[in-house]
Amino acid sequence: MGQESFIYSFVARGTMILAEYTEFTGNFPSIAAQCLQKLPSSSNSKFTYNCDHHTFNFLVEDGYAYCVVAKDSLSKQISIAFLERVKADFKKRYGGGKASTAIAKSLNKEFGPVMKEHMNYIVDHAEEIEKLIKVKAQVSEVKSIMLENIDKAIDRGENLTVLTDKTENLRSQAQEYKKQGTQVRRKLWYQNMKIKLVVLGILLLLVLIIWISVCHGFNCTD
Amino acid sequence: MFGLRKSPANLPKHNSVDLKSSKPNPFDSDDESDNKHTLNPSKRTTSEPSLADMTNPFGGERVQKGDSSSSKQSLFSNSKYQYKNNFRDSGGIENQSVQELEGYAVYKAEETTKSVQGCLKVAEDIRSDATRTLVMLHDQGEQITRTHHKAVEIDHDLSRGEKLLGSLGGMFSKTWKPKKTRPINGPVVTRDDSPTRRVNHLEKREKLGLNSAPRGQSRTREPLPESADAYQRVEMEKAKQDDGLSDLSDILGELKNMAVDMGSEIEKQNKGLDHLHDDVDELNFRVQQSNQRGRRLLGK
């Protein structure tokens, strides 16, 4: 089948292209090579460059760069899916050490047709792959939201711990307050009682004084 | 759809079926005379069931050597073992006949369907857990609000206590005024009650038993007849996988909404807790002051 979405693909070690494949002619290999020179080789990541209605997609991992040039009508996810497949296949075939010693374009004959097969497969199954990518994206979205939620829940847990300490402190203060309130009430009750008794004593004394003054003593028969 | 995970690149060229041959569909071929499709039995290992002995192990046809179900069963389990083993014991994928590869394709398709169904079940379990978590979070949010209301009640009671403590000084002592750094406002009422409504809705669904019903089984597909060829069976499995994936996508959409609701609920609670912290600090400060006043009164 003549797929025309993928234009060119290569696998490189550092900046040395080990295998490449294309069915077209054009200046894209040189542009891709220029992009490869500028790639930060240390990091494991994905890069996409746009140029003249084409996307240059790179996947860098463990010192190897996997590239595909595609028409910009093809979604980025499909290109990345292709690169992931190529990476897995390349590692499976040459992971034993052959890739680390291979010279420039020495794997063209072996790995070129494999890249072609992968291109055809990806284009043939684009719809299905997109479905899977969509589900994967949903999973990662839910995962990232839940990771944020976990962070928030941890903060909430810490908040609750601090609040527990504060309320515990408040409880002990409130108990102290209650105890003191009881003591104050008791003290004031005694004070009140004392005052009442003193007033009663004074009243009795007054009555007694009046009695004595009226009756000229305790004998009041007259 | 996902029956064969490996691309055609992994199958060597000599094993590919010539599409220009007289047969329009290579999967329909039961005729093993063509050397393009089969290999000589001498190349086979002993563990592999010989195709000469049976017509189609997957089409439900009888094994010719004997009608005993045990021999049929052993052949089938043997094939299953080989599939799980990726034909390692019988010369690898390259050395298999078209018929065996058809069987392998069906097996792989069924395995993939099973894994999709497994994912769906896991997603449904997660959804029910998420529903419970959301309900629990909502309940905890209400508890925090109730606690905050209690703090307001404590504030009212404390104000009355402070008034009484202020009036207990005696005639000649200077009046005691409690210090208030800030007023206690109580819980912050937010207008957005969507999580509450959502939780109520989810609770209703849970009570009605709607959440527990697996959606993957909702679509009923007519089972294929025994005579159906491998291609049809793979296509049917693909359709099942598509259904499973769309169900999974729907559940993931729900899970995302639930996760967002959880996030907003936790955030709301965190804000509420911050306010509650401040109010509890204020109450602590004022109770401490009241205690000092009480001690002074007791000391007189």
From Swiss-Prot, chain A:
Residues 1-197 are cytoplasmic. Keywords: Cell membrane, Coiled coil, Endosome, Membrane, Protein transport, Transmembrane, Transmembrane helix, Transport. It comes from the Eukaryota. SUPFAM superfamilies: SNARE fusion complex (SSF58038), SNARE-like (SSF64356). It is found in: Cell membrane; Early endosome membrane. The chain crosses the membrane at residues 198-218. Residues 131-191 form the v-SNARE coiled-coil homology domain. Expressed in flowers, leaves, stems and roots. It is a single-pass type IV membrane protein. InterPro entries: Longin-like_dom_sf (IPR011012), Longin_dom (IPR010908), Synaptobrevin-like (IPR001388), Synaptobrevin-like_transport (IPR051097), V_SNARE_CC (IPR042855). Residues 10-115 form the Longin domain. GO terms for cellular component: early endosome membrane; plasma membrane. GO terms for biological process: protein transport; vesicle-mediated transport. Residues 219-222 are vesicular. It holds the Pfam family Longin. Its main location: membrane. Belongs to the synaptobrevin family. Involved in the targeting and/or fusion of transport vesicles to their target membrane. This is Vesicle-associated membrane protein 724. It comes from Arabidopsis thaliana (Mouse-ear cress).
Curated annotation (Swiss-Prot), chain B:
The modification Phosphoserine is found at S29. Residues 235-297 form the t-SNARE coiled-coil homology domain. Induction: Locally and systemically induced by pathogen infection and locally only by mechanical stresses. Residues 1-76, 176-228 are annotated as: Disordered. It is found in: Membrane. CDD domains: SNARE_Qc (cd15841), SNARE_SNAP25N_23N_29N_SEC9N (cd15861). Gene3D superfamilies: 1.20.5.110. Ubiquitous, with a strong expression in root tips, ovules, very young leaves, vascular tissue, hydathodes, stipules and the abscission and dehiscence zones of the siliques. GO terms for molecular function: SNAP receptor activity. GO terms for biological process: cytokinesis by cell plate formation; membrane fusion; protein transport; response to mechanical stimulus; response to other organism; vesicle-mediated transport. PROSITE patterns: T_SNARE. GO terms for cellular component: cell plate; plasma membrane; SNARE complex. Residues 190-208 have a biased composition (Basic and acidic residues). Interacts with the cytokinesis-specific syntaxin KNOLLE and with SYP121. Binds to EXO70B2. t-SNARE involved in diverse vesicle trafficking and membrane fusion processes, including cell plate formation. May function in the secretory pathway. This is SNAP25 homologous protein SNAP33. It comes from Arabidopsis thaliana. The gene is SNAP33.
